[in-house]
């Protein structure tokens, strides 16, 4: 069987996944993308063209705070930290996602 190809993220889920990965602590963009890939067992692969606009949007909304730091390989990197407003937003997005998944599950079971 050929290897499964990466799946497309559902619209509106990238912010949720980024915020969720930052719950355990700050990370740089590449680290966030790798964490999403790892946790999804290689189903989701977040490209730079999606990741960095999302991080900018989350920064502008006050959900993450960027700070310059040094990565594990001794390079300068921008680290993102979840803010208290980001934690509230994450909780709201998780509730909404669960509501939508529940509705989809109902249709699949009852149709």
Language model: regions and residue ranges:
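Basic amphipathic alpha-helical segments that dock to polyanions
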Residues: 51-58
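Beta-hairpin "wing" of winged helix-turn-helix
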Residues: 59-76, 81
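Short beta-strand/turn micro-motifs at beta-sheet edges
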Residues: 4-8, 68-69
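N-terminal helix-turn-helix DNA-binding core of bacterial DNA-binding proteins
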Residues: 6-50
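Amphipathic alpha-helical dimerization/coiled-coil segments
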Residues: 88-111
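Accessory beta->alpha helical hairpin/"wing" motif in late/C-terminal subdomains of nucleic-acid enzymes
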Residues: 82-86
């Amino acid at each position: 069987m050929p290897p499964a190809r990466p799946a497309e993220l559902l619209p509106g889920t990238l912010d949720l996944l980024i915020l969720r990965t930052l719950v355990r602590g700050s990370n740089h963009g590449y680290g966030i993308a790798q964490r999403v890939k790892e946790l999804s067992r290689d189903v989701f692969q977040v490209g730079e063209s999606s990741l960095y606009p999302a991080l900018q949007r989350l920064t502008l909304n006050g959900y993450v705070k960027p700070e310059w730091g040094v990565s594990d390989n001794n390079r300068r990197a921008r680290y993102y930290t979840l803010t208290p407003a980001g934690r509230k937003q994450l909780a709201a997005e998780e509730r909404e996602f669960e509501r939508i998944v529940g509705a989809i599950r109902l249709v699949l079971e009852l149709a």
